């Protein structure tokens, strides 16, 4: 099960007027491009009107700090006040391999730490907690305006991004990155607190975690154990945090609003017509060519 919906990089709708030589009137809905939003643009009025749920600023801040970025591209969550982290097994599988000792087969037999001393440090793993967001669109676009050519504008943009990232990283002590939204329509500065001491707590056997294979990967409900548990340490002790998701024994009920928070790798919902035409005419055919050759060879 892949977490695909998120508040970090979630999108809200834009209306596109496509000029193809004649006037074309189309009705558009605010959610034509999906119900995906960033935290800073969550439609709280819509939540309350449609679901009767009041998403206060305190609630948004709490869930933002409870969700974390796991390694280079997965989602995870704090699920206890002692730094316990839950993520998907396929996100942690490679890290499990890195702490497997001689004579062990953790992929086949799984792993469980009965106490804190049994938890295994993963030297190549970190988690990031989003703590600060700043809209820096005006700063970057203003810097680009000084350029007279596309090359100059691109160079000025890169220089300004580096300047902003360096400034806020130095001032806050956080890891700050400028994130591009809407193909350059908006630039946000995301500042993360990074935790480098992360230890393996539990990982099921690969056969149990991946039961059903890829065909079941896009079904719901899915009957497998695609989860893994780690723990974040701070100064050699389990991290103490007031921001975490409480475990629910009952699960969701019918009609209950459900929010999924995480870190998607990318989205293609806002591609332009030119980009889609290029994909249709070049990218997709180039991808299909070797696949068709292989299919004909095997068949």
What are these regions, as identified by a protein language model?
Residues 21-299:
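Terminal presequence/propeptide segments associated with secretion/organelle targeting
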